[in-house]
Amino acid sequence: MCIFCKIINGDIPSKKVYEDEDILAILDISQATKGHTLVLPKKHFDNLLTISDAEYLKVMKKVKDLARVIVDAFDADGVNILNNCNEVAGQSVMHFHVHILPRYNKEELKIEFTDHSKECDLDSILATIKEKMAK
């Protein structure tokens, strides 16, 4: 049983922000930024690629609602909504979850994207995606 399933079952304590029959939202123990919250379905899905559409929509609706509350509660200057899918992308707990990361003007947390455009053929990438979507 994964650590989030143990939290959902009450075997491990957590700081619950929100709970209903389908969803649990808890404070992330790392608090990468003040108010950093995790939103997860109570039903176990390993990641974004395996969660059902119905459960995904429930989680994301609650993410939106909680993001508004958290930004307002801490007077944040912005917010990142983040999901890591699989270990290579930084997923450390194999139970689908979404991070709400309030952002503040004076902080050290960086989420940056490196420009690889010179190494990529955008037309080829687009064709590959469209071909896969057509199947």
Q: PLM features: residue spans?
A:
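HIT superfamily nucleotide-processing domains
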Residues: 1-135
